[in-house]
Amino acid sequence: MYPYRELDAGKRYVFITRDGYIKQSPETEFEPKRTYKSRASTAIKLKSNQDRLQAVYYIPDQEDYDVFLASYKGYGLKYGLEEVSEVGAQAAGVKSMNLKEGDHVQDGLVFKRKQFQEALFITQRASVKKMALHDFDRTSRAKRGLQILRELKRNPHRIQFMIGISQNKFLVNLLTDTKKLVQINPDDYTVSNRHNNGSFVLDTSRDGKPVSYYLSDNDSHL
């Protein structure tokens, strides 16, 4: 939810979808209609029945921003937000990432270019790794990107979650399908390179597979 006092065409929203599309839309595109109390307005046109919105970001200024996308099969792509054109609320946007067969965009981050940005990756096998996104070369929109997980022939890792790490300290509370809760402190992890698959935080055969997470203050330990 993004509150506002008045709509401003200089402010905008960035939408990132599962099927590999991205767009920017001015805030004024979302002026409430007469039926706003009973009927939701369209924010983006999805390309397929399987498509869904993976991330939304509010951009309040005209500073330089970068986009980082992570695919389910472990590809990462970084490029400038200026490569994404501004379009209306009814549009689907432009291609964000060149996806392999059976792959999809799992999540995306949008952050100020001058900002030091890290990300925490959690795989379906409950492995955790931290990466510094400034180590990625800024390339172009709609490319495939680089692998950020080492591919294994047997039981390969797949990205379940990507969490942007800000200067504010927090804990990641990871929940499994057997209702086991594990706390992860991003500060406990050193920055890894692209070919590292991270370290396991639990045994999925015993504790279940990761299904969701929430963030809490750094002092709210279990």
PLM region spans:
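Short, structured "edge-of-domain" segments at secondary-structure transitions
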Residues: 1-222
